[in-house]
Structure formats: structure tokens, C-alpha cells
Amino acid sequence: MKVGEDSNGSLLIDNLSLTTSAASIGNNAEGSITLTNHTNWQFDTPSSNIFLGTNEGSGTLYVLEGSKISGLQSIRVGEFYGDARGTLVIDGESSSVTSKIAIIGDQGTGKVSVTNGGTLTSLTQMNIGYVDAHSSLSANQSSYGEVLVADKNSTVNAPYILLGGYNTSSVSDTTGILTVSNDGVINANSYIWVGVSSNGTGMLNIGGAQGEAAQPAGSINTPRIYLGGTNASTTSILNFNHTNADFVLTSYIDGKGQVNQVGSGTTTLSGSNIYTGDTYITKGSLRAGKVDTFSPNSDYIVDSGGDLDLNGYSQTLKTLALAGTATLSAYENGHEFTPTTLTINGNYTANDGLLVMHTVLGDDNSVTDKLIVKGDTSGSTRVMVNNAGGLGADTLEGIKIVEVDGLSEGVFSKEGRIVAGPYNYNVVKSDNQNWFLTSEIPAGP
């Protein structure tokens, strides 16, 4: 079946069952096919393909109202030429496309949206803005692929997903973007690779796309998210741009790419993450779901609107630049207090950041949260200390809350009153190095 082959054309198929061996939509022209009202389109040969937008063409396929496509070897959306444009829309409960492989943006521009309960399934792999080696390469062509999965019961399934890159030297640049929002679901039972090779850009968005307003999150079910390719020209970004108060990512994140918390929601990480790129928290909260889930290989930058929340789980970071909030423990009155330690292997810098801690306010031996800096400290930090059930007591040296191994030039000052019983506590520097809580009983009137 060919629609839009060298001349423009369109086709509407309503409530039919049909079987074909292949389809081309928009080859050197504009073409579109719309399936509605539970149409069932079956492909019957091992090499069956659908091409959407090839050469200089523009091809669009709408799969709507419970319609289904199955039996495909491949579905190829935007392929073989820089001006090729392909669009696939799967919309509506039970609307689905199933193929052995799905290729979106291979030397062309491909866009896919899966919404309102639709499903796209690739049985082997899904390439988004990724150029595979094949016989139809055109030299120095760019590739752009974008997939949106949105709304409840909307699902993308693939063993693994590749975003932005190539395994051949005959392309100039590639971009692959995958966004999941508003209860959409991505299932990749092996991994998602974000930014595969040099000159490749890969972006995985939970919630809104980068630069757009935050959206309710979707979910990602994959054991591994790999950020980054083989050299510095690869761009790999994982964006948490959502509004959910309870989004949890269980995947482990590795590679060289960047992690951004940019939405107003709370993202809880619970994988054993080891990525080496920077972590930016500009808005909302990045929260720990277990001990050592924050990557110890990453530089953390917390802006004034962001919160790095250890949530009662001790963590180790490479460096920390704090202009926002770092919250250590999560104590509840009447419960036993377990202290939390934030260890910085490198330097700690602050720009009026807020460090929130809990301490059983008593004598020098009191149990407390602690900040340990192996490198140097600089800048100003406000310290809010909440009492975890202490009754107050005299201190001699004090309760150590900040330990500095390197050059101790940072200033830590008390934020609000720190009180237990008749005692007031102050944040003071001792031995020109570390910071302590020291107690006093204020003089009477």
C-alpha cells in the first residue's frame, strides 16, 4: 500500500480488517492514513514494513479509537533524508501498534505521540534519533526523533531504547527525546541509553519536556538508565520536570550525563546510582529513598528554590554547592531518632544555603545529624537545628555538627532559636576548624 508516493494523498480506513505486506506513507510527497473505529491492520510477511516520511516526503499515520496494527518487521518514522518528516499518532484506549523494531528519526525527523490509553510495542529495540548502519545511508544527514507518552494506560514497551546517536560515521548530528507524563508508562526491561555516541544528544524527561512547564509525572520501569556515550561531544540529560509529591525512580543511573530536578515536585531515588555528570536541583526536591542512592561521583548544585533531602538516609557526594536547602533527617516526635550523615568527599561551597538538621539536644555526647567535609568549605550557611527529644544539658566543647578536614573558611550561623528545656544552643566554631552546638542558660530578668 502506497499513499503520498510522489504526489499528495490521504486515506481513511473505518472499522475494517485488512492484510497487506508493506506500506509507504509520504515518499517524496505528503501522505496520511487514518485508522478509526477498531480497524485491524495485519501485516503478513516476515519483512513487512511501514515507512512514514521518506526521502523528502512527509508521512502521517493516525491509529485511533481502538484500532490496531500488528505483524510488522519494522515501523520507520522519518527516514533516509534530512527533509523527511514522519508522524505517528496512537490515541485512545486499546489503540496499538506492534512491531519487531521501531525507528523514529533516522536521517530525518520522526515524532510519535502515544496518548489516552494507546500502546506502542517494539519487540526487540526502539531507536529514537538514533541512526543504525544500513545500506541506505545518506552522508552528513541529521536525525531528530521525539516520543511522547502521556495519560493513564498509555504505554511504550521495548526491551531497550536508544536516544540520540549512531553506529556509523556517515551522519552529522542526532537528537533523541523521550518524554513520559500524566501517568503514561515506559517499560524497558533491559535499559534506556540516553545519548549513545559522539555528536549525539539524548534527553529523557519525566513530566514536562525541557524548557516547558512541569507536568504530572509518568512512570519508567527499567533496571538501568545509562547517560552518555564515548566522548565529550555527547549530551545526555535526565530531567525530572514534574509536579508529583511522591514520584519514585527505582532504576540505577550510570554514565557521564547530567541529572536535573527542575519541576516543583519531589523525586525519590532508590537505585544504586554511580553517574559522573552534574546534578542540578533548581526547583522542588531530590530525595533519597535508601542509603547511598545519591551518586558519590557527581557534583551537586542546589539553587535557591531547590531541596536536597536525605530523608534520614546517609549519603556521600563528590562536591556540594548549596544556595537552597539540604535536609538531613526526618525525625517524628515520639519515635527513636537515628542520625543522618552527609559526607562531601571534595569541597563544600555555600551561598546563603540552609542546612536542616536534628539533634538530641543535651551534652557533648548527644546524638546528632552531621555534615562531614573532606575538602574545603567556603561561603555562608544558615543552620536550622530541630530538637529530637533532648532535654538540654551543659556542654563543654559542644556537640559537633560540622566536621571539616580541609581549609575551613565557610561560615555556619544559627537559623532561628535552638532550645531544649532551659538551655539555648548556639552554633560556634572551635579549634578554628569544626562547628559545634554549645549550650547556655540565659540570665534571668
Q: What annotation goes with each model-predicted range?
A:
Residues N28, H38, N55, G66, ...:
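Generic structural motif
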Residues Y81-A84, A133-S142, N167-D173, S198-G200, ...:
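Short, solvent-exposed loop/turn segments that connect beta-strands within catalytic domains
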Residues S7-G9, L16, S21-A23, A29-I33, ...:
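The right-handed parallel beta-helix/beta-solenoid scaffold, focusing on the short coil/turn
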Residues M1-E5, S24-G26, S48-N55, R76-Y81, ...:
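Extracellular glycan-interaction patches encoded by glycine-rich segments
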Residues N205-G207, A213-I220, S233-T234, N241-H242, ...:
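Extracellular beta-solenoid/beta-roll
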